[in-house]
Amino acid sequence: MGSATVLEVILAIILPPVGVFLRYKLGVEFWICLLLTILGYIPGIIYAVYVLVV
């Protein structure tokens, strides 16, 4: 795991869409993460960390 990935994961825990945006910009992953974060903060975090690590 590189330093950029660690920073993205930390941002994904604090504000999930920001961490995903840094890697995928306005792609499908970002919009899914934003929707999950709006519907429930914890699902947004789980999805963001999953997308960034896998």
Curated annotation (Swiss-Prot):
The keyword Transmembrane helix applies. Induction: By cold shock and salt stress, but not by drought or abscisic acid (ABA). The keyword Transferase does not apply. It is found in: Membrane. The chain crosses the membrane at residues 2-22, 34-54. It is a multi-pass membrane protein. GO terms for cellular component: membrane. InterPro entries: PMP3. Expressed in shoot meristems, mature leaves and roots. Belongs to the UPF0057 (PMP3) family. This is Low temperature-induced protein lt101.1. It comes from Hordeum vulgare. The gene is LT101.1.
